[in-house]
Amino acid sequence: MKINIISVGTLSKEFQVIFDDYIKKINFYSNVNLIKIKEFKSNNKDLIIKNETMAILEKIPKNSKVFLCSLNAEQYSSEKFALFLQEDNISFVIGGSHGVDEKMFKGAWKINFSKMTFPHQLFHLMLIEQIYRGFSILNNKIYHK
């Protein structure tokens, strides 16, 4: 099993340390790969969205089940989210600060973590923690209560 997290931008050293700690825990269950997309700089928001979306799409492996993190999506419980992790090849997409062109992600599942807004770096930790929690649920580990 392989999980890709394709994200626009980078993590600070402090957030990267925590992120890497979760990856070590998850590697017992699955291989996790963080694919970083460079932020596109422009004063034109539409151009930023277009270029970042295209860069993300180029990095999605063939035959990967794509989960687009979106404000325009359904929210799931941790137990339901865990069921998504039973796919063989998964790619989670985290767009940049302006989002992505969601029409370009045909066939992708859309997931929403909250109606609240979170800092980009914090969301990485929320996603990786839910992936770890999901594997804990699937494997009947005490972590999820």
UniProtKB/Swiss-Prot annotation:
The lineage of its organism: Bacteria, Bacillati, Mycoplasmatota, Mycoplasmoidales, Metamycoplasmataceae. The gene is rlmH. S-adenosyl-L-methionine binds at L68, G95, F113, S114, K115, M116, T117, F118. InterPro entries: Alpha/beta_knot_MTases, RlmH-like, tRNA_m1G_MTases_N. The keyword rRNA processing applies. It is an enzyme of class 2 (transferase). Its main location: cytoplasm. CDD domains: RlmH-like. Homodimer. Transmembrane segments: none annotated. Specifically methylates the pseudouridine at position 1915 (m3Psi1915) in 23S rRNA. Its EC number is 2.1.1.177. This is Ribosomal RNA large subunit methyltransferase H. It comes from the Bacteria.
